[in-house]
């Protein structure tokens, strides 16, 4: 991983930032969701998504590369065996950041970053649900129109 060149770093130095991201990613994969500051969550998202993409490939070389980034064998094993198969049908977007209220002590903006393990709805399924909803709405409209005609006929 190249040393970050621009902007402020978490923890001050580039090496400390790498360690922070490594630990945050390990906790994210272990627990599924973590609560952290906005800045850390925004830096963690691409870091974690690249690691998950390597885990999806599942080769020995990828496993070794991930072990260089996250030196916790249990977490890496969990990532490759249990989490990666959940993301097979998904092309990116493995994490979600949800804004939380500011931290009480120093008013730092907080976020929850979590893994998105829900199934992706296929485009065909989405189309089918939209079509069913529009068909139902059309039937209701037709039923209302028929009722209005009946009421108008009864009044005459």
UniProtKB/Swiss-Prot annotation:
InterPro entries (alphabetical): Ribosomal_bL17 (IPR000456), Ribosomal_bL17_CS (IPR047859), Ribosomal_bL17_sf (IPR036373)
Keyword Nucleotide-binding: no
Annotated region described as Disordered, given as residue ranges: 127-156
Regions of compositional bias (Acidic residues) in chain numbering: 147-156
Compositional bias ranges of the Basic and acidic residues kind: 136-146
The keyword Cytoplasm belongs to this UniProt entry's keyword annotation: no
Highest taxon of source: Bacteria
PROSITE patterns, sorted: RIBOSOMAL_L17 (PS01167)
Residue runs in coiled coils: none
GO cellular component, one term: cytosolic large ribosomal subunit
Gene Ontology molecular functions: structural constituent of ribosome
PANTHER family the record matches: LARGE RIBOSOMAL SUBUNIT PROTEIN BL17M, RIBOSOMAL PROTEIN L17
Subunit structure: Part of the 50S ribosomal subunit. Contacts protein L32.
Listed NCBIfam families: L17 (TIGR00059)
HAMAP family: Ribosomal_bL17 (MF_01368)
Family the entry assigns: Belongs to the bacterial ribosomal protein bL17 family.
Protein name (record): Large ribosomal subunit protein bL17
Source species of the chain: Corynebacterium urealyticum (strain ATCC 43042 / DSM 7109)
Lineage: Bacteria, Bacillati, Actinomycetota, Actinomycetes, Mycobacteriales
